């Protein structure tokens, strides 16, 4: 009689989809209003002048202009702004 024992189970059979996070427009680039500048988890970089923050912490341009990255504030945080 041909028999085959049951194969053992593995705990590694999962893989999540890529999230495509990161900087989408770099310093000095011209952007239009609504352009996504950074996709991130949490406020690693904070919104500055003319930059909005979505509910998933995506930073986007509120006006047309040039992207500028800088640090500042009491806690020396990273900011991104749009200069018109």
Curated annotation (Swiss-Prot):
SUPFAM superfamilies the record matches: Ribosomal L27 protein-like
Q: Which domain of life is it from?
A: Bacteria
Q: Which NCBIfam families match?
A: L27
In its UniProt entry, the species of origin is given as Francisella tularensis subsp. holarctica (strain LVS)
Q: Where is this region: Disordered?
A: 1-21
Q: What is this protein called?
A: Large ribosomal subunit protein bL27
User: What does the similarity note say?
Assistant: Belongs to the bacterial ribosomal protein bL27 family.
List the InterPro entries hit by this protein, alphabetically.
Ribosomal_bL27 (IPR001684), Ribosomal_bL27_CS (IPR018261)
**Keyword tRNA-binding attached:** no
Taxonomic lineage of the native organism:
Bacteria, Pseudomonadati, Pseudomonadota, Gammaproteobacteria, Thiotrichales
Q: Which gene encodes it?
A: rpmA
Which UniProt keywords are listed? Ribonucleoprotein, Ribosomal protein
